[in-house]
């Protein structure tokens, strides 16, 4: 998928720990124009389809719940697509020359500026078109639009599986793309992979 997912849950019966069907994905700064530009930002539970609306592969996966998903996890992705695992993200980084240059190779040629507002030269050599969508912090604020891109994986972080999952981070000011872990309540972008 060459763009971030922009699917809003509507009518999904989900209510856990103050997260309802209206608060499991967001537009950056709650501005609909940012969804059109960057796609939505999802909690890990939403990305995994923890309520099992479409498939049971990610059912029960969410904050404070360790899970053993059945791979591939369709999650919130359209039929015939799935949420990439940590291994799939790492394979993508390797395929384009390694993590040290993956950011430069896969980031969009526009939208990336450094801290001084100077344009960053990215090649988007594989038409993957990563945009700096930023993320939603678990307590509700939004950060890093124009500076970073964060994408969920379907893989829990092994040391804190109930609370954290792996994601990829793309920097405006560096050529690399890195794998880290994030709090599952955070709002990150989603890219889907064709089955």
Residue positions per predicted region:
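Conserved positions within compact, well-structured domain cores
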Residues: 1-195
